[in-house]
Design a protein with these regions (language model features):
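Short beta-strand/loop motif that positions the catalytic acidic residue
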Residues: 170, 176-178, 182
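Catalytic histidine-centered segment of alpha/beta-hydrolase-like enzymes
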Residues: 45-46, 207-220
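Conserved HGGG/HGGXW glycine-rich cap/lid loop of the alpha/beta-hydrolase fold
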Residues: 5-44
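Conserved alpha/beta-hydrolase catalytic His-Asp/Glu region
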Residues: 118-168
Length: 229
């Protein structure tokens, strides 16, 4: 059955703007009611309070949530708050516990490293895109990072570094889009997320960590299939 009347909520990755969903949105059929939540529109800074603030917006309707990277824990918290109103979840290369040892380092690095230069472009192309798609794929990421609230960005990095493992289960159906090469989210983090889900399936999609940007066509298909389950 086509659940076209159910709202699909997209929660962005670390940049927090939602700008990087542009290609993905082009691939999701217009019959779906899709809303992108930008973290710049949210006052809250901790994972749990971000979820509480977002939950207020959607508490009277049934929703389907797509959470990219950083947003995994917000999605998890939303499932706990909204319960049966969340009809399903797709995680895009996401995590609900600390994704890797590198995430601790990320929170103390100067934000100047996120400005585009030869080194930062190369690092993002390597770690975010697995050196595929041509070096120009990193440009929109840097553009969105320049637009985001830098103080909030720093706090989001800190949130990732200090993530404790949650213990409550997610009851709704969960689909996890796992990039073929994710250099930022370790397999143990994915396994832990899977263990917290009552109904979990994994979809392996060709690409790097920025999977919605490097393979929007397949990601959109997985999302639409999950919504229609």
């Amino acid at each position: 059955a086509l659940h076209v009347h159910m709202k699909i909520i997209l929660l962005p990755g670390l940049d927090g703007t939602g700008i990087l969903f542009e290609k993905l949105l082009e691939e999701i059929p217009s019959v779906f009611d899709v809303e992108v939540v930008s973290y710049d529109s949210i006052k809250a800074v901790s994972y749990s309070s971000q979820a509480i603030e977002i939950a207020e917006r959607f508490k009277h309707e049934d929703i389907f949530i797509v959470g990219e990277s950083y947003s995994g824990r917000v999605v998890y918290e939303l499932c706990q708050i909204l319960g049966g109103h969340v009809k399903g979840v797709v995680f895009l290369a996401s995590f609900i516990s600390r994704p890797s040892a590198m995430s601790r380092v990320a929170s103390i690095m100067p934000l100047g490293l996120l400005k585009p230069n030869r080194l930062s472009r190369f690092m993002l192309y390597l770690f975010g895109f697995n050196m595929a798609g041509g070096p120009e794929v990193v440009a929109p990421v840097f553009q969105s990072l320049q637009k985001t609230d830098k103080r909030k960005l720093k706090l989001r990095l800190s949130n990732i570094a200090h993530l404790a493992k949650p213990t409550e289960k997610i009851d709704c159906p969960v689909t996890y889009i796992r990039p073929s090469t994710d250099l930022l989210v370790g397999i143990n983090s994915v396994k832990y997320l899977a263990s917290m889900c009552s109904n979990f399936s994994r979809a392996k999609v060709n690409g790097g960590h920025f999977i919605a940007q490097s393979n929007p066509v397949v990601c959109a298909k997985v999302i639409c299939n999950a919504v229609n389950m």
